[in-house]
């Protein structure tokens, strides 16, 4: 390039994204991993006056005998520095400062060829020209940052402290005043102008860094301590309820139940400790599916000890395999555009897995349209059958059955015609049934019958109120996912009642399986623990206009419906569907103690895993992917824990 005259004003800039340690690690928070290298070169030699901008300690002779300067700059300054060199507007969200050394490499910042001849007589005119240009660039740079500060302060919930904002504003006003004075002195800016603009930019960068990237270790320690104390208290209450249950149930054989508790907490510990690995967070659905399959294989092995494999264990294992394939689809980056996960009435099944023998035939064309309808019809039949056989009150039975059937009819209507009124009717019916459940519950209308029968009816009515809304938000994958959820739940309950531990009214392993199944369904339905993993299209099913509260509620139900709402409200089935021989004559106190154990254990499992998520985020707070990976995972788990606690409290008010 030195020999090419027309390239003398060319600048070459090469920058890496980040570096790595000597052993190849490149994702952590050490200086070796987060720092990078920037190489800037131009064929044109700098005037001696401009070379004085570079500190003497940073420059020296290279291997080729030419002068090479090595300095440092904040990565925050890169975007605005390149924008200044290219002569394009500064990015609005950038709060960096144009780097003086990088800016000095550009001949356009000090070249005198367009200035009067008198400038050529002064050797220092290059430096004066550069100072004038650099001060002008910093003025625009500061104006852009100040505009961002004002916009952020006006829209942010937290914002910056008022004292800090007042100080930053004062620095900006002083710099602007000096710049205005310098413009009135025949283009002779003083060093003070550059210094004051630099002070303003550096001061705000420090303030922003302290507010956005520096963490309060004391508050983090307090929060983590609260988590640990709550878990200890949770364990104490669980053990207390376990002891009371044994006393009321006249149990003398406790070893088998304790063995289940140890195995369940071993699985919880394996999953929780795995959160300390960023690789696990990226494959959480697969690992949860693996742990769930481990419990199924263990149940089959236990059956083999008695010489017979139970059909529900085989069905459960087959379902887990099917769920694994669904997780692979849901966790793929193409999930957002996967037709299986769409919301409209078009094709919702990926036909690539079908043999080429069937491609082009009517069967392949009709399958995506027919199969969701067939499964939806099957779900409506099962709902009608179990509601009529479980709920004894004729009035409640009629209302719930008609409401559920109408909801399924509106879902089918929406898929066939895309009429927006159909989803709205589903939402109204679901909300009405939910409110009606609580009203009838506290009026005493649902208090008839034995305790087990009453709890079973309450749980079935509650699940029937929520299922259609969650189903329509999931799209045409909804019927298949809900059917898988029902069959898997039946397998878990059957395994609890017919396994080795027939005397246990509350199976810890069954609760653990219930929790793992909920996690698997979350990922199978195409959700991610990232903000771009939210299925925003679900929030507009039935609506064309955007309303913040309405769309937020629908998006929230779509995200947490299949993984939190349905699993938690259906937990009473683990207690109320025992063997027929053991269900008769069960004391009411024992039943509610067992139900309390189930909810305590489910909440404890969620609390332990969330605690390790918090610990992982605290450890990885300086990681390169902290905002892209760990922070979203923390947000999802924290909201999931809060929702779990709220739903458990609602369940306690509703079922007890």
Indicate where each model-derived feature is located:
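Metal-dependent active-site segment of extracytoplasmic phospho-/sulfohydrolases and closely related
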Residues: 1-31, 38-39, 82
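Short, solvent-exposed loop/turn and secondary-structure capping segments
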Residues: 24-27, 50-51, 94
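Alpha-helical transmembrane segments of integral membrane proteins
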Residues: 213-656
